Structures are given as C-alpha cells and as structure tokens.
C-alpha cells in the first residue's frame, strides 16, 4: 500500500496504521530490541497515575501502553483513530475507543491526566493536538508525552541516524506486514523537533511546568507538563 507522507494527512496515516496493526507490537519489539517495554514503564512512572484517577492514553494503538498504565489502579481509557490498531488490541482487557486526536470524543475537563506515546509526531498540527488534550484534562491535570527525540551524544546520533534510514526499513521488511510504513516512521523521526523545541511547543499550547527527561541517550524523551488551574 502507499505509505503516509510527512504531510500527515489523517486518512493516509490511519490507513497506514490499519495495515500494520496485526504485527505492530511484534515489529516494535524487534526494531527496538525490546527496549520499548522499558519506555512504557518509564512513561507510567513519569505520569504517576493514582488509583481511582481517570487517565486518557492517546494514540493508544493496540492498547499495550494502556495496559501498562492500568497497572497503577487508575481508570485508563485508550483512544486511537486507527480502527485496525484498535481491532488488533481487542484481546486486552482495557477500554479502547476510536477518536481523532484533534477532535477528541470526550467532554471538557474529564481526565486527571493524559499521555501520548509515539503518536504526537503523527498529528498534522502538533500545537492544536496539545490544545485539544488540554481541553479534556482537568485544571491542574498532568500530561506526559513519550516520543522519539534527538540523541544527545554526537557519535551515537550518527549511528542512530544510519540505523533509522538503512537498518530499520530492512528489518521491517522481515517482520512487518507493511514495511513501507516504517520508511515514514524513519522520516518522521528525523523531521521531529528536538527536546527543547518540543518543550516550547508544549508551553505555547497552554501547558505549564514543562520539562523533559531523556531515555536511551535521547533516542526517546519524556516531556511532562501541567494544565494551569
């Protein structure tokens, strides 16, 4: 199938994820060497959901991140606009709903906290997506964004870039049901802003107390923020 482009047209992105849903989790584990499990645990720790809190997990895909967050005892709802991904996650005992990140199917001030892992990069309008997340989070509520970022060690950065553009698509051909989608993945990661720039975007979207923590040498960064009271 035709892969999505960096124009990030919603229908193209949704079709792309629909196509990779069945093998998405397996492919990610292979491509990351299993580190994706540690990233999910770090995201849960950073967000720090409490028992009884309502949390929305955006770009939840197959619900693997939703299941991890649910270990906290919070009521976690996964939301994604790819029906194929949601279908692939039906076996998980977590609530999953269909919804567009730019027009979420939730009322204002519904959630105590929100998280989005490896999904903000796919929004056509990053700032608009962050404002929409703020709409559904209660005043004083928390946000954690887990996303690919910029390695902080120059030599490591060079090796990582080579992996993205050469090795990643090659490995994807072996394990993925739609390897072309991983060409988009590599391109979108390279085009994504670095840690400091993303922090400014989050702040400009109305969030406060914005900060970040690097994981795996900056391959991934966890940005956190709070909605003003």
UniProtKB/Swiss-Prot annotation:
Pathways per UniProt: Quinol/quinone metabolism; menaquinone biosynthesis; menaquinol from 1,4-dihydroxy-2-naphthoate: step 2/2
GO molecular function: demethylmenaquinone methyltransferase activity
Pfam families, alphabetized: Ubie_methyltran
Name of the gene encoding the protein in the UniProt record: menG
Residues bound to S-adenosyl-L-methionine: 62, 80, 100-101, 117
Reaction equation(s) it catalyzes: a 2-demethylmenaquinol + S-adenosyl-L-methionine = a menaquinol + S-adenosyl-L-homocysteine + H(+)
Listed name of the protein: Demethylmenaquinone methyltransferase
GO process terms (BP): menaquinone biosynthetic process; methylation
Keywords: Menaquinone biosynthesis, Methyltransferase, S-adenosyl-L-methionine, Transferase
Family: Belongs to the class I-like SAM-binding methyltransferase superfamily. MenG/UbiE family.
Function, as annotated: Methyltransferase required for the conversion of demethylmenaquinol (DMKH2) to menaquinol (MKH2).
Enzyme class: transferase
EC code: 2.1.1.163
CDD domains, alphabetized: AdoMet_MTases
Organism listed in the record: Corynebacterium kroppenstedtii (strain DSM 44385 / JCM 11950 / CIP 105744 / CCUG 35717)
Cross-referenced SUPFAM superfamilies: S-adenosyl-L-methionine-dependent methyltransferases
């Amino acid at each position: 199938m035709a892969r999505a482009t960096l124009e990030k047209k919603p229908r193209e992105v949704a079709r792309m994820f629909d196509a990779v849903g069945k093998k998405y989790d397996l492919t990610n584990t292979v491509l990351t060497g299993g580190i994706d499990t540690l990233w999910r645990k770090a995201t849960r720790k950073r967000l720090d959901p409490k028992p009884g809190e309502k949390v929305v997990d955006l770009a939840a895909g197959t619900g693997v991140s939703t299941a991890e967050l649910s270990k906290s005892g919070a009521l976690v709802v996964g939301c994604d606009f790819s029906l194929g991904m949601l279908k692939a996650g039906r076996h998980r005992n977590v609530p999953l709903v269909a919804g567009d990140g730019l027009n979420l199917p939730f009322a204002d001030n519904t959630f105590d906290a929100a998280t989005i892992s490896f999904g903000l990069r796919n929004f056509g309008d990053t700032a608009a997506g962050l404002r929409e997340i703020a709409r559904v989070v209660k005043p004083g509520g928390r946000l954690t964004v887990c996303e690919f970022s910029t390695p902080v060690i120059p030599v490591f950065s060079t090796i990582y870039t080579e992996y993205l553009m050469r090795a990643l698509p090659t490995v994807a051909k072996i394990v993925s049901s739609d390897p072309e989608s991983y060409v988009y993945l590599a391109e979108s990661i390279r085009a994504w802003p670095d840690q400091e720039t993303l922090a400014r975007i989050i702040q400009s979207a109305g969030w406060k107390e914005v900060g970040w923590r690097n994981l795996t040498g900056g391959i991934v960064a966890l940005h956190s923020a709070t909605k003003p009271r």
